[in-house]
Amino acid sequence: MTTSTGKINLLGLTQPEMEQFFDSIGEKRFRAGQVMKWIHHFGVDDFAAMTNVGKALREKLEAVAEIRPPEVVSEDISADGTRKWVIRVASGSCVETVYIPTDDRGTLCVSSQAGCALDCSFCSTGKQGFNSNLTAAEVIGQVWLANKSFGTVPAKIDRAITNVVMMGMGEPLLNFDNVIAAMKIMMDDLGYGISKRRVTLSTSGVVPMIDELAKHIDVSLALSLHAPNDELRNQLVPINKKYPLKMLLESCMGYMATLGGKRVLTVEYTLLKDVNDQPEHAAQMIELLRDVPCKINLIPFNPFPHSGYERPSNNAIRRFQDLLHHGGFNVTTRTTRGDDIDAACGQLVGQVNDRTRRSERYIAVRQLSADAELQDSAVRH
């Protein structure tokens, strides 16, 4: 993609695209592999540092291309080791990238949009409205920046980033081409060499793009379910009105069938106090997913200002998990990480230049609600 300088940003080019680029400037295709290794293996963003590339070619590259990662605005480190980067993209908005370390892995949570084109009622990102899709360079640039921060080389066995999840800001399938390109670079040995089983795309349910996915890439799939019936899901995840549960699950199963082996769908379910955490919801979920090869990841709600939702009690969370487990499912409850730096699931907000005015409307509605509560309280007293 050409940047504001009129040059091509090589950071976001897949291997075939990089080869085509070198063809276009009259150079041999093997140069693509050399340059990709410098960019992704060694974190180089200056052609002058590419010591096995001749001076004449380096000068040619300087004239027509660049390696431009997004700008890091800030970095915060949680008490539990979670890291969050605020990154400014070309649109002027800021997005957030989160690194979550555990004993046996390091997971990078990557954003795909500035804001989100969807409006899930319990997610702070959606309340920021929507500005733009990230470019492929801005998506893969989050991996590049994190590796640079850790000073790691992907060829090392002890690398910090072992898994990537497209679960940051935005709906990945509504930025299809750029997300696909970035994931291909993640898995390419000339890029970051991450196993396809360790790259996960999470979607709220854009059915046509799920159907298209298998034609382009083989990655793990996670479904943001959050409700066991259409009536409730229509409220929590409004895209369900367009693609209801039966259609959505058929699409997910169709994609999983193309992967073969023992791959299963990950089902994500944010638990909201007195909304979707009752025994009847667990029973409906067991029935809904009975024939779906899946594992279930329960996510206790992480509060944000004016959300209108609360986190269930620990007893309610355990009860819900136990009911699903007795129903025959592999169930885990996600440990909240990074909440002291607002890096927990559902808390990512960035700084979005909202083109939809959704954020403005959301704040106005919440203010009206707060004013009404104050008036009611005054009347009662």
Curated annotation (Swiss-Prot):
User: Which residues take part in binding S-adenosyl-L-methionine?
Assistant: 170-171, 202, 224-226, 302
**Tagged with keyword Secreted:** no
Cofactor remark: Binds 1 [4Fe-4S] cluster. The cluster is coordinated with 3 cysteines and an exchangeable S-adenosyl-L-methionine.
- Entry EC no(s): 2.1.1.192
Highest rank taxon of the organism: Bacteria
Q: Where is the active site?
A: 96, 345
Q: What is its main location?
A: cytoplasm
Keywords attached to this Swiss-Prot or TrEMBL record, sorted alphabetically, are:
4Fe-4S, Cytoplasm, Disulfide bond, Iron, Iron-sulfur, Metal-binding, Methyltransferase, rRNA processing, S-adenosyl-L-methionine, Transferase, tRNA processing
The family database entries (Pfam families) matched by this protein are listed as: Radical_SAM, RlmN_N
> What catalytic activity is recorded?
adenosine(2503) in 23S rRNA + 2 reduced [2Fe-2S]-[ferredoxin] + 2 S-adenosyl-L-methionine = 2-methyladenosine(2503) in 23S rRNA + 5'-deoxyadenosine + L-methionine + 2 oxidized [2Fe-2S]-[ferredoxin] + S-adenosyl-L-homocysteine; adenosine(37) in tRNA + 2 reduced [2Fe-2S]-[ferredoxin] + 2 S-adenosyl-L-methionine = 2-methyladenosine(37) in tRNA + 5'-deoxyadenosine + L-methionine + 2 oxidized [2Fe-2S]-[ferredoxin] + S-adenosyl-L-homocysteine
Q: What class of enzyme is it?
A: transferase
Q: Where in the cell is it found?
A: Cytoplasm
- Which cofactors does this gene product need? [4Fe-4S] cluster
Q: Which SUPFAM superfamilies match?
A: Radical SAM enzymes
Q: Which InterPro entries match?
A: Aldolase_TIM, Methyltransferase_A, RlmN_N, RNA_MTrfase_RlmN, rRNA_lsu_MTrfase_RlmN/Cfr, rSAM
Any one Gene Ontology BP term: tRNA methylation
Q: Which cysteines are joined by disulfide bonds?
A: 109-345
Q: Where is the Radical SAM core domain?
A: 102-342
Q: So where does [4Fe-4S] cluster get bound?
A: 116, 120, 123
Q: Which GO terms describe its molecular function?
A: 4 iron, 4 sulfur cluster binding; metal ion binding; rRNA (adenine(2503)-C2-)-methyltransferase activity; rRNA binding; tRNA (adenine(37)-C2)-methyltransferase activity; tRNA binding
Q: Which family does it belong to?
A: Belongs to the radical SAM superfamily. RlmN family.
Additional record remark: Reaction proceeds by a ping-pong mechanism involving intermediate methylation of a conserved cysteine residue.
| Summary of the function given for this chain in its UniProt record | Specifically methylates position 2 of adenine 2503 in 23S rRNA and position 2 of adenine 37 in tRNAs. m2A2503 modification seems to play a crucial role in the proofreading step occurring at the peptidyl transferase center and thus would serve to optimize ribosomal fidelity.
Question: Would you tell me the protein name for this molecule?
Answer: Dual-specificity RNA methyltransferase RlmN
Q: Which organism is it from?
A: Pseudomonas putida (strain W619)
Q: Which gene encodes it?
A: rlmN
